[in-house]
Amino acid sequence: MLFKARKKNAEQAVNEFNQVMKPVSLWDDAWKRLRKNKMALIGLYTVGFYILMALFAPLLPVYPYEEQYLAHIYLPPSFKPAGEVLLSQKRAYTAKLMAKEKRSEYTEQERAEFEALERDIQTNPMHKRHYLLGTDSLGRDVLSRTIYGGRISIAIGLLGTVTALFIGVTLGAVAGYAGGWIDSALMRFVDIMYGLPYMLIVIIMMAILGRNIFILFIAIALISWLTIARVVRGQIISLKNSEFVEAARSMGASSGRIIFKHLLPNTLGIIIVYSTLSMPSFIMSESFLSFLGLGVSAPLASWGSLVSDGVKGMELYPWLLLIPAIAMTVFLFAMNFLGDGLRDSFDPQSKNKV
């Protein structure tokens, strides 16, 4: 009996020792530190919510984003049916007109208009709609257009980031590993590209090739790979003479296998951080182009085009500017919080900071 108890205690001690000495991977360590960063977690959950909204936008119970109804133009945000909002607007306008003309009763024409509107509200199902965030100049639902606008903006940011990563990571890895004249030629090309006016090139491409969502993210991505190319090149140069690379080389591994199988996986941390920090830059670039009238074409909408439309009537209809601007600002802040958290999580120097 005593022997069994000692054996059990010994096994328990061995298990506890194994748990303590169990190696922790980079990803486990990064996730552990990320969970301790409250702002990064808020950013992660917020970004996740936005992406889910963008992915499942067609399944959401919102009105079609392109549907127009001119009887409902410029309705303010409200929980009431559109007919009630329309009627209250007309009453408020008529009351101001009566005060200006110093009269206390409706005219016959005004009574007839009110009766016609009330009959229309009772019979027309469109007046039973609820526009929680109001409508625009064509009677389109602002909530629906903000959701679908986010879908376009996030897609442009995501596709632009993926394209920039593909070009920048590939060229940076090849330049860093090959060295010599290949490295010099590629880096001189990067230096030349850095000297060119980035936004001017994008504007010229959009003006020549037309307003197309595919052209838009390609135009942005083709100029945005320069930074990640330099970062990856520096990482590859610092790693290419490591022992694990020498071991792979001695076993006959090709240069391509060493780059993509051994070196790039060790740079994934910095690549992920770059992705989360560059995506807001793509969205801001798209918004700037939309503000200049070079964004997506109607009836499509992005956050940038919605903000551009909202600026035109911001004094009379402030919700047309504030709602898409707030939606975009929250997403950009969330991406930056997440990017900062990931940077701290993957940075070994930040272990004692979290």
Predicted regions and their residues:
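Gly/Trp-centered helix-boundary motif
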Residues: 1-165, 169, 313-323, 327-334, ...
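Alpha-helical transmembrane segments of integral membrane proteins
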Residues: 135-354
